[in-house]
Structure formats: C-alpha cells, structure tokens
C-alpha cells in the first residue's frame, strides 16, 4: 500500500490512472459529501482508497447514455488546496481514464516538468 505522502506527491507531480466503471449519481453523492466539510489530505487519501475498493468489489456496469455521466469534479482540502478528479469514456462505454491533480484558482498546478515542456514547445 502506498503511503499518504507518496500518494499526494505522485498525484501532484504525475497524476494517476486506473480502470473503473461507476454511474454518475455515486459521484454526486461523493461531491456533496466533500463540499459540506473540508477534508485533510489524509482524509482525501482514505476516501480515494475506499472508492477504489468499492469499485473493485462491485464492478458496476456503465449505461449506454453518456450524458448521464460527469467528466470531473473538485475536492477542496482544509489547507486551501483543491484537487481535480477527471475521467473519460471509451467508445464501448468503459470508463477508462481517472486522473487526480492539484489545482490553483481552478487551473492545474504546474510542476517543474510542465514548465520544462512548455519552454521546450
């Protein structure tokens, strides 16, 4: 199991991905839970682990109507940091990409590698 610090550091630097199939209303419930109170990075990490375990246990099927799905949501941590969760669907309705990255004023927080890529372009 990854430590909390390693998880947050990696998420802030690289993001992460995993395969998941889950309907939109679960995210709505999760979003409202988070918006009602501030979460520490530790709590965010624990919720993320719980969500992963729940998805692995259920293996829920995606429905045909893509419009019933969101493409991302924000989570605010108690230290003022915000995290953006994003995901996308493949043509066969499988939810394939699920990313987490830190945001500043609604924009992705730039890492050193992002800056170097921008300069090289």
Describe these PLM feature segments.
Residues 1-121:
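Ribonuclease/tRNase effector modules and their secretory precursors
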